[in-house]
Amino acid sequence: MNFSAVILAAGKGTRMYSNKPKVLHTLAGKPMAKHVIDTCEGLGAQNIHLVYGHGGDQMKAELGEERVQWVLQAEQLGTGHAVNQAAPEFADDEKVLVLYGDVPLISAETVENLLDAQPTGGIALLTVVLDNPMGYGRIIRRNGPVIAIVEQKDATEEQKLIKEINTGVMVATGGDLKRWLAALKNENAQGEYYLTDIIAAAHDEGRAVEAVHPVSPIEVEGVNDRAQLARLERAYQAAQAQKLLEQGVMLRDPSRFDLRGTLQCGMDIEIDANVIIEGNVTLGDNVVIGAGCVLKDCEIDDNTVLRPYSVIEGATVGEECTVGPFTRLRPGAELCNDAHVGNFVEVKNVRLGEGSKANHLTYLGDAEIGKRVNVGAGVITCNYDGANKFKTIIGDDVFVGSDSQLIAPVTVANGATVGAGSTVTKDVNENELYISRAKERRIANWQRPTKK
């Protein structure tokens, strides 16, 4: 569909009590404005003009300077003035869609309906009926068709009784929009150039104005403070949870589940309470996720169990694995099939072979670990000398005793055993027992120091 979009994002957001622009506050882990940009890109917008006024450098850094055409509104003189800053870029014959960076839940379906509804030479306007329309511009109709929009501060008492309100979202043809914007005046209670005044201008020219309702009213709710943002967050999460339930995912408590990215699921997934999904996560069949787990940009294969309060980021977990509780898998961690990683184990940039186990209180970093290896409690791969990192290689069928330190670079060959409490500084040969311990000392009749 041939259209361009204008996203208004110049407001200060003073009620957010924040140093960053309002539209950069996140919903589901993503800046509000990015939700709107993604919707436009998904529908194939030819150009996306983002009108900003405050924190331009910060906005460009977070939203991506190349994704949109940046339009500065140096003075905030109203919505009509804001759109007019981008008007020189509009093609005369293209559809121009006006959206808002602080209205993040607008759906692709609603936008498509609005674009399709635009009458030739006229305007398609998104409206909604509210039980309490206080503060919103009212839709004025005459025998059915929309003829004008009156803002709350300019409305008569009779007009204030109208419950159909303007959302601000609309579509018009570029050439018409430029002409109507150029003719706007600020003769109103707020001394601003209202975008809504183009409705009356279109009517005066005999152009049709078609009103369209959103798929869901929550889509057009804006954010002015943190309470409103929290409300939209809960609405968004409830919708995501409902979709997953309908796809067969068992959410033990849908109200305590957060999806802040994308989730691809197999069959018979079980997710307990307070689980957070971030980035791109893929789950195979029969995966069970315990309470309080956080998953980000990871893949979990079939029949794997993630026990409570495990954090997995940038990792790959194979089939039939057990992780947790209280495990941290960091970027580059790869657990092969039937691997076990237990409580208070941290793994980074490590391949843990099939059937291998590290069940207790262990740090594994920058290591290649073979099959059927047992890593005892308190084992540390010492991979960093303060400037550089080094690799530990452990072969198949190795047993590493508790409280051992492996000082990289070092190799422990197939079948070797490292005795508990050892500090391994040299390579260990196949099927060798390596023990490194200080000589014991015993002092009879020892008296502990006492306070004087």
Curated annotation (Swiss-Prot):
A GO cellular component annotation in the UniProt record: cytoplasm
Listed InterPro entries: Bifunctional_GlmU, GlmU-like, GlmU_C_LbH, Hexapep, Hexapep_transf_CS, MobA-like_NTP_Trfase, Nucleotide-diphossugar_trans, Trimer_LpxA-like_sf
MF term (GO), any: magnesium ion binding
UniProt: Mg(2+) binding residues: 102, 224
Keywords from the UniProt entry: Acyltransferase, Cell shape, Cell wall biogenesis/degradation, Cytoplasm, Magnesium, Metal-binding, Multifunctional enzyme, Nucleotidyltransferase, Peptidoglycan synthesis, Repeat, Transferase
CDD domains given in the database record: GT2_GlmU_N_bac, LbH_GlmU_C
Keyword RNA-binding included in the entry's annotation: no
Catalytic reactions of this protein: alpha-D-glucosamine 1-phosphate + acetyl-CoA = N-acetyl-alpha-D-glucosamine 1-phosphate + CoA + H(+); N-acetyl-alpha-D-glucosamine 1-phosphate + UTP + H(+) = UDP-N-acetyl-alpha-D-glucosamine + diphosphate
Pathway(s) annotated for this protein in UniProt: Nucleotide-sugar biosynthesis; UDP-N-acetyl-alpha-D-glucosamine biosynthesis; N-acetyl-alpha-D-glucosamine 1-phosphate from alpha-D-glucosamine 6-phosphate (route II): step 2/2; Nucleotide-sugar biosynthesis; UDP-N-acetyl-alpha-D-glucosamine biosynthesis; UDP-N-acetyl-alpha-D-glucosamine from N-acetyl-alpha-D-glucosamine 1-phosphate: step 1/1; Bacterial outer membrane biogenesis; LPS lipid A biosynthesis
Residues bound to acetyl-CoA: 377, 383-384, 402, 420, 437
Leading EC class: transferase
Active site per UniProt: 360
Protein name: Bifunctional protein GlmU
Gene name in the database record: glmU
